[in-house]
Amino acid sequence: MPVLVELRGVSKHYRRADTGETVVAVEDVSLDVHQGEVLGVIGYSGAGKSTLVRLVNALELPSSGTVTVAGRELTAIPERDRRLARRNIGMIFQQFNLFRSRTIAGNVAYPLKVAGVPKAERNRRVAELLDFVGLLERAHAYPEQLSGGQKQRVGIARALAASPDLLLADEATSALDPDTTSEVLALLRRVNRELGVTIIVITHEMDAVRQIADRVAVMEQGRVVEVGDVYDVFSAPKTGAAQRFVRTALHDRPSPETLRRLRDRHPGRLVTVQITDEAGLQNRIDAAFRAAGVTAELVYGGVGEIRERRIGSLTYELSAPAGGSGAAVASGSSGAAGGSDASGAIDAAIAALRADGVTTDEEAAA
């Protein structure tokens, strides 16, 4: 897939006016955004996400490194040429940034008017875009007459007015309720699929990434610490930052508080098994427990979908009768005391799952 945006060794440093201290906003970022994809860029406040957006659309220039969009190195051309290049980059914002004194149609038409598009062509394009975002009947309304979700739809229509190849969405759903967020993300996905627009979604919400993105870049302290296919990052996050974000979106692992409550009710060993879209995975899990003579009670977990692929985890309470059986006996643990036999059977079940490639973690005792 062709690369639309290319960042190489990009850093952005600021000097504080009051102290003279150097602040590192973005540090040594190299990243490709492929044409036609939706890339989620996620990080906590202060991670450098919004600065990265301003570097991509050349509202700011990097302290070092290069930014190339659609084959043009924005860091190496005059400001006049950068302004022209920005017409190929649409932008939507958290707070909508609509003109209160203009109608909905007037807001969408504004960038076309600035670009000198003839009135008849402007009107045609505005009607087309308002129909696409489902607001054609509100063309003559004013922003204060719209809900937050409707305002963001206007923002999306305005960002698409000049038919850009690239759309930047900077925390575009952060001010919206969950239902409206899902609607706006679904609209952005339509923009990507039906119009072929490449989208970079800047967010601190991993659930938004799960719903819309093809790939995700995780930022921490100005650096991109992990990049990958969304499913791969969710199923096997490699960095602590990615692991924390995944937990907030899946809610499939017990928190320390939940774990304490589970232990009060379930005295057996608590083991969490990762669920993926592998064929027959659940049958293999059940078979491993049966072969070891282990009783498995499901006590926590959740399984969802990303791009129609299953993902999640299930936490079981594992117990075995004193004396052991199955794989535990075969491994020679039957001569131990009753408690050791039961523990050996559970160890055998866990070992069998891991040998079969199933990610299995025992929840540590409090």
Give the positions of each predicted feature.
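A short, surface-exposed alpha-helical micro-motif characterized by mixed small hydrophobic
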Residues: 209-211
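ABC ATPase NBD coupling module
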Residues: 19-20, 74-90, 114-120, 233-237
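ABC ATPase "signature
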Residues: 227-228, 236
